[in-house]
Amino acid sequence: MVRRKMDEKGVSPVIGVILMVAITVILAAVIASFVFGMSNVAPAAPPSAQLQVRTGSSADTVELKHMGGDPINCTSIKVLVNGKEESNALGSSGGCSDNLLKVGETETITLSGYGGQYVELTLVDIQTNKPILMTHVTVGG
């Protein structure tokens, strides 16, 4: 009986190709996980608070009462009346005396020139540029 010698030259390139393909697939998966952001970073959200707005006791004012939720930083709030920004509307009286409006505190918002009018009042968080409150109220007059 004649013994044949097996030719092993054909096996080596096949194994090499399989290893290169496997390494390429693993590398692509690692890069894709970084590119597509598989991280736990969530987009910033505005403070979540229950706010009550009512007609102010004096002319050109409304009262804002914090009923629950996150404290509101008075220095990072934009006040919009009928879609237009009101500068210096939040004062340093009442709840905002320490720049934070906390649960149970009330702040007076001055809206000059709107006395007696029914307006749309929006409070926007400056850091996220998202609304905290959107409501309609009659301004004290």
Curated annotation (Swiss-Prot):
Broad class of where this protein is predominantly found: membrane
Membrane topology, as annotated: Single-pass membrane protein
Name assigned to this protein: Uncharacterized protein AF_1096
GO annotations of cellular component type: membrane
Transmembrane segments: 13-35
Domain of life: Archaea
Source organism of this protein record: Archaeoglobus fulgidus (strain ATCC 49558 / DSM 4304 / JCM 9628 / NBRC 100126 / VC-16)
Compartments it resides in: Membrane
UniProt KW keywords: Membrane, Transmembrane, Transmembrane helix
